[in-house]
Amino acid sequence: MVMMSKQLTAQAPVDPIVLGKMGSSYGIRGWLRVFSSTEDAESIFDYQPWFIQKAGQWQQVQLESWKHHNQDMIIKLKGVDDRDAANLLTNCEIVVDSSQLPQLEEGDYYWKDLMGCQVVTTEGYDLGKVVDMMETGSNDVLVIKANLKDAFGIKERLVPFLDGQVIKKVDLTTRSIEVDWDPGF
């Protein structure tokens, strides 16, 4: 007879958020390098459970252990016990349900909240919609897909996310971001 656990575990994230991804295998015992997208790299371990997608299906994975190794962080997942098993997970995104993330203070937001926001200059020129965010060494960057009839013939704009300097106002209610930016760039 199989014993069923009374603890109900989520089968799939309701509102999936990517927190990082698994890199190449390390050693022969199933360890993997991990790349964290969280502001403080180690914070990725604070949010559980983790999910991955294999062949279009969600799978929950259990973190057994993690440690620093040289410049990398490496992880050991439960049931991943050799290099071959670890290699199957290389490049898998590490996903959690948004309910695992901390509640934000008034006026704060996650990158995911900015996706799809309309970006308008302080002069009222519509630059387009946020389609992605990029991390650079110095600051984050909004990737904005320009409108089809953009007067400057621009398809995509990269606008530095410099709060106060370039970013003048973020309004998640109206899904808009006001920026001090030359539309010709």
Swiss-Prot record:
Keywords: Chaperone, Cytoplasm, Ribosome biogenesis, rRNA processing. It holds the Pfam family PRC_RimM. GO terms for biological process: ribosomal small subunit biogenesis; rRNA processing. The keyword Cytoplasm applies. One of its GO terms (molecular function) is ribosome binding. SUPFAM superfamilies: PRC-barrel domain, Translation proteins. Residues 106-185 form the PRC barrel domain. Binds ribosomal protein uS19. An accessory protein needed during the final step in the assembly of 30S ribosomal subunit, possibly for assembly of the head region. Essential for efficient processing of 16S rRNA. May be needed both before and after RbfA during the maturation of 16S rRNA. It has affinity for free ribosomal 30S subunits but not for 70S ribosomes. HAMAP family: Ribosome_mat_RimM. This is Ribosome maturation factor RimM. It comes from Shigella dysenteriae serotype 1 (strain Sd197).
